[in-house]
Swiss-Prot record:
Degraded in response to injured neurite. Degradation is caused by polyubiquitination by MYCBP2 after recognition by FBXO45. GO terms for biological process: NAD biosynthetic process. Keywords: ATP-binding, Cell projection, Cytoplasm, Cytoplasmic vesicle, Golgi apparatus, Lipoprotein, Membrane, NAD, Nucleotide-binding, Nucleotidyltransferase, Palmitate, Pyridine nucleotide biosynthesis, Transferase, Ubl conjugation. A lipid is attached at residues 164-165 (S-palmitoyl cysteine). Its EC number is 2.7.7.1, 2.7.7.18. The gene is NMNAT2. This is Nicotinamide/nicotinic acid mononucleotide adenylyltransferase 2. It is found in: Golgi apparatus membrane; Cytoplasmic vesicle membrane; Cytoplasm; Cell projection, Axon.
Length: 307
């Protein structure tokens, strides 16, 4: 498959990120590497979406702190960003709602075809720009080669990086604004783009807990969007999926990353990180990046069991 016929993917991870760990970042990297190796996908971006404060989880520190820690954790990444939309809503949002928000938003700001897993575009190729006279923001006068889908969407991201949402005292975060004026950005209507939910096997297993998830939401998440699962602690994902009728029904929409099952980051968790911080355990440097640790110590977070 050529670059233009592959499905372009944005990986979206929802969660508490309380705090965000090296394991979370490695989850993105492992998922991207795995999808690229299949030869069917090009991952063009990753989104970290921390949960709203009203989620009510014990020990959950405020979104103000969690957003800043997430931003510090991805500051050196050229493809993963933090999106505060979920935190800035009036109340907690379901995972399904967050996925739908980003799907609808990307439709508006990129002009791309965003396909459901079960209804892929029949012509996943780059179309013609609507405005052939405008100077595209991706154009390099010294390199007049044809732009690729990934380059186009990458430059859309650069344009949007100037659009920030500011809510004092939270620092500035770049995110996609549905009211953004993209200026001379060319819109290509026939790039097949999907937003996939990225998660660990623990979230997948939670789908099997009766009453925890709304079944209609599960149908949309797994049936329409699709999931990329990065197993933790050598979890048996086949066994997990067999315990849910919806997961069995849409098993072809669930991609399990099969790389090194003994990956050192697969055992890292936010819970272990909080415990290490509370006990002064030096192993915390194995779990969290140094900028995140520095911020936690400066802000005196997770000092006691209540967060």
């Amino acid at each position: 498959m050529t670059e233009t016929t592959k499905t372009h993917v944005i990986l979206l991870a929802c969660g508490s990120f309380n705090p965000i760990t090296k394991g979370h970042i490695q989850m993105f990297e492992r998922a991207r590497d795995y999808l690229h190796k299949t030869g069917r996908f090009i991952v063009i971006g990753g989104i970290v979406s921390p949960v709203h404060d009203s989620y009510g989880k014990q020990g959950l520190v405020s979104s103000r702190h969690r957003l800043i820690m997430c931003q510090l954790a991805v500051q050196n990444s050229d493809w993963i960003r933090v999106d505060p939309w979920e935190c800035y809503q009036d109340t907690w949002q379901t995972t399904c709602s967050v996925l739908e928000h980003h799907r609808d938003l990307m439709k508006r700001v990129t002009g791309c075809i965003l396909s459901n897993v079960n209804t892929p575009s029949m012509t996943p190729v780059i179309g013609q720009p609507r405005n052939e006279t405008s100077q595209p923001i991706y154009q390099n006068n010294n390199a007049p080669s044809k732009p690729t889908a990934a380059k186009i969407l990458g430059k859309v991201g650069e344009s949007l990086s100037r659009i920030c949402c500011v809510r004092p005292p939270v620092e500035r975060f770049t995110f996609v604004d549905e009211n953004a004026n993209l200026g001379t950005v060319m819109r290509y209507e026939e790039i097949e783009l999907r937003i996939l939910l990225l998660c660990g096997s623990d979230l997948l297993e939670s789908f099997c807990i009766p009453g925890l998830w709304n079944e209609a939401d599960m149908e949309v998440i797994v049936g329409d969007f699709g999931i990329v699962v990065v197993p933790r602690d050598a979890a048996d994902t086949d066994r997990i999926m067999n315990h849910s009728s919806i997961l069995r029904k849409y098993k072809n929409n669930i991609m399990v990353v099969k790389d090194d099952i003994n990956h050192p980051m697969s055992v890292v968790s936010s819970t272990k990180s909080r415990l290490a911080l509370q006990h002064g355990d030096g192993h915390v440097v194995d779990y969290l990046s140094q900028p995140v640790i520095d911020y936690i110590l400066k802000s005196q977070l997770y000092i006691n069991a209540s967060g």
